[in-house]
Amino acid sequence: MAKKVTGVVKLQLPAGKATPAPPVGPALGGYGINIMAFVKEYNEKTASQAGSVVPVEVTVYSDRSFTITLKTPPAADLLRKVAGIEKGSGTPNRKIAGTITKKQLRQVAEQKMADLNAFDIEAAEKIIAGTARSMGIKIVD
């Protein structure tokens, strides 16, 4: 028989640097799971992606065990790295924060494809282009 799920917790944590302090402790403590075990497993799985934020979905079961599902980094983080900027524009339609090429846009879309509601790469590119536009990142040919 399958284990009964008691909750699903979604967190965005720095890769390889999770600690039991907030936000991890309070978010997972209510479910009664071993927070140190989660932190250790998360840090091992994300050690290779150091420097980026990695979203994680923690499924908690009735016997206080859990499974970790890692997602791809947020599109905004990927776009910031590709554009080489610290943060997006505060006024996206007036001030351009940076530029990326269509080739770079396609690379980000391919990386995010698994987590997007898109059936083909062109649809994924449109989703990522919208995120870039809202951040003040201009897409050039």
From Swiss-Prot:
Keywords: Methylation, Ribonucleoprotein, Ribosomal protein, RNA-binding, rRNA-binding
SUPFAM superfamilies, A to Z: Ribosomal L11/L12e N-terminal domain, Ribosomal protein L11, C-terminal domain
Signal sequence segment: none
Ribosomal protein is among the record's keywords: yes
PTM annotation: One or more lysine residues are methylated.
InterPro entries assigned: Ribosomal_uL11 (IPR000911), Ribosomal_uL11_bac-typ (IPR006519), Ribosomal_uL11_C (IPR020783), Ribosomal_uL11_C_sf (IPR036769), Ribosomal_uL11_CS (IPR020785), Ribosomal_uL11_N (IPR020784), Ribosomal_uL11_N_sf (IPR036796)
Any single Gene Ontology cellular-component annotation: cytosolic large ribosomal subunit
Keyword Ribonucleoprotein annotated: yes
Gene Ontology BP terms: translation
Any GO molecular function: structural constituent of ribosome
Purpose of the protein: Forms part of the ribosomal stalk which helps the ribosome interact with GTP-bound translation factors.
Subunit structure: Part of the ribosomal stalk of the 50S ribosomal subunit. Interacts with L10 and the large rRNA to form the base of the stalk. L10 forms an elongated spine to which L12 dimers bind in a sequential fashion forming a multimeric L10(L12)X complex.
PANTHER family: 60S RIBOSOMAL PROTEIN L12, LARGE RIBOSOMAL SUBUNIT PROTEIN UL11M
Family recorded in the similarity comment: Belongs to the universal ribosomal protein uL11 family.
HAMAP family: Ribosomal_uL11 (MF_00736)
Protein name (record): Large ribosomal subunit protein uL11
Organism: Roseiflexus sp. (strain RS-1)
